[in-house]
Amino acid sequence: MNPTLGLAIFLAVLLTVKGLLKPSFSPRNYKALSEVQGWKQRMAAKELARQNMDLGFKLLKKLAFYNPGRNIFLSPLSISTAFSMLCLGAQDSTLDEIKQGFNFRKMPEKDLHEGFHYIIHELTQKTQDLKLSIGNTLFIDQRLQPQRKFLEDAKNFYSAETILTNFQNLEMAQKQINDFISQKTHGKINNLIENIDPGTVMLLANYIFFRARWKHEFDPNVTKEEDFFLEKNSSVKVPMMFRSGIYQVGYDDKLSCTILEIPYQKNITAIFILPDEGKLKHLEKGLQVDTFSRWKTLLSRRVVDVSVPRLHMTGTFDLKKTLSYIGVSKIFEEHGDLTKIAPHRSLKVGEAVHKAELKMDERGTEGAAGTGAQTLPMETPLVVKIDKPYLLLIYSEKIPSVLFLGKIVNPIGK
């Protein structure tokens, strides 16, 4: 039996990422060279963010097609980061397939890893109003003896933490990993790993955790039970939050949908896309990066009466199956080439699990404290009521980049 490399992609808490790339040039030229390097990293990060959005839309369409009537929630950034890190260990057709599937093929490999390094460094924030953490942990069996260069690059580019794990005792290894994840998430995610394939010698865990409060919070005293209309002429009662305020809002005639931005603190925005009656599939088909860019041009500041369902949902997907939709499969097979991790071992990715969890309430996402007030101009408000299936993006203006992407067909369902 060939040893397998387990890959688990989780959404959780990680320590603050710090810049780890060290200059190898003289102090006199440091400023000029660092400015050039910084510019190149920003350009690479910007292109990667665009490709991450494209990946997210592709996966959302595929998952929606194969999982009709089901809530979908994922982090394209989390998935891309993990597989970009695996590019450090992949070669030949296995590497080419990842680059093709994830839209990395036109980017030099050095720019690819430096671009993700920049994204991780720039997006990681920890303040009273916002906590955003991204990172990776490698659980490695001593039998593997991985290449030092792979470990160093994983640390330098992806701030990867390395933890020795005895995969010969699968029960103990499972407990160690689950305890680690539980600790990092302050008990929010428990027993995430349900089983580990025999023969596993390494497991990679990618994390992204987001907790923020709204720039202007909803008043929980006005939240009330209202109807949310499902796709098949039925409805469920959901706690509907309400607020009147100034928001960026627009309408797309081509895709028959309303676009509403509700800002969090610190340049993070929740973007709600509400299709007209019977237009959800039409909207899904039209999802692409250029569509998102066009939406931005349609927005204007208006006084809006907003009604949004409170929700708490989890999206769990088998990436081995999901990524086959975009042509990525060799890394999971016996003939996959991961010899840059360990040249004398035949490795494959045995497990690939993506789990994303979202809690959205009156205070924000994952809860926070504080209040906010807003003075409104005297104008007739536009009414936007999110009371039927919709799409949701959580978006950072800083890179800019889509952090999370979802299709919500039932706020209280699975």
UniProtKB/Swiss-Prot annotation:
Gene name of the encoded protein: SERPINA12
An annotated Gene Ontology molecular function? molecular function inhibitor activity
Know anything about its domains from the record? The reactive center loop (RCL) extends out from the body of the protein and directs binding to the target protease. The protease cleaves the serpin at the reactive site within the RCL, establishing a covalent linkage between the carboxyl group of the serpin reactive site and the serine hydroxyl of the protease. The resulting inactive serpin-protease complex is highly stable.
**What does the UniProt PTM comment say about this protein?**
Glycosylation slightly decreases affinity for heparin, but otherwise has no significant effect on KLK7 inhibitory activity or thermal stability of the protein.
| Pfam short name (any one) | Serpin
Q: Where is this site: Cleavage?
A: M378, E379
Provenance organism: Homo sapiens
The name of this protein is Serpin A12
Q: Which SUPFAM superfamilies match?
A: Serpins
- Which SMART domains is this protein grouped with? SERPIN
The entry's stated outcome for D305C is: Results in formation of an artificial disulfide bond which stabilizes the reactive center loop and enhances KLK7 inhibition activity
**Documented effect of changing R302 to A/E:** Significantly impairs KLK7 inhibition activity. Slightly enhances KLK7 inhibition activity
Effect of substituting N267A: Reduced N-glycosylation. Loss of N-glycosylation
Similarity comment: Belongs to the serpin family.
| Tissue distribution | Expressed in visceral adipose tissues.
Q: Which compartment or compartments is the protein found in?
A: Secreted
Please give the subunit comment from the record: Forms a stable complex with KLK7.
Residues modified by carbohydrate are N221, N233, N267
Activity regulation, free text? Inhibition of KLK7 is enhanced by heparin.
Give the start-end ranges of region Reactive center loop.
364-382
Specify the effect of N233A: Reduced N-glycosylation. Loss of N-glycosylation
Signal sequence coordinates: 1-20
Please give the GO cellular component terms listed in this UniProt entry: extracellular space; plasma membrane
Question: What job does the chain carry out?
Answer: Adipokine that modulates insulin action by specifically inhibiting its target protease KLK7 in white adipose tissues.
